[in-house]
Amino acid sequence: MPAHRMLHAHPLSADLFASFGSVIEIGNKTGRPVNQGRAQRIKGTRDLAHAAGAAPVVDLYQVETSKLPFTVDCLERHPLSCQIFTPMRCARYLVIVAPTGADDKPDLAHALAFIGSGEQAICYGAGVWHAPMVALDDIVVMTMTMWEFGDARDCEEFWLAPDHGLVVQP
């Protein structure tokens, strides 16, 4: 008998996401004036952890639309770099994360799901297990920023058993 774990997707917030990385958004934050007073510089994130010798990469992701409920079949992590996704064209997207268990695999019993908006960027901390990007409502275009070596060290994948996966509900 299948034993899927059902996750309820919560609105993405900095507090709920803090143990996995950071949410970068204006929200109700105030900044400091820059550019002769024509702009506000609002603090985003300063935790841009990456291994020495890794090269900075900025790529574009165009993500096809998925529907809820969504079945997660794979989680990945980037042990040597944080990874930032910044919306360029986006309504909503799904963020699925899991802490690392004692066996160094994702702890699926404590996985969480969030729904982010087009006004929220996310920074996964280095080594954080997460699902690949999932677009809701429409195609999503994001920039992805991280540091890479260009080999297998950059990404580890964990495939979930088909009958013991995660299903995200609205």
List PLM regions with ranges:
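His/acidic/aromatic-lined binding-pocket segments of jelly-roll/cupin-type domains
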Residues: 83-86, 121-122, 133
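Non-catalytic, conserved peripheral segments adjacent to functional cores
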Residues: 1-113, 137, 150-153, 158-159, ...
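Conserved metal-binding segment of the jelly-roll/cupin
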Residues: 115-129
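Short, structured patches in soluble enzyme cores that scaffold and shape functional sites
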Residues: 97-99, 126, 144-148
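Ligand-binding loop in jelly-roll beta-barrel domains
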Residues: 127-143
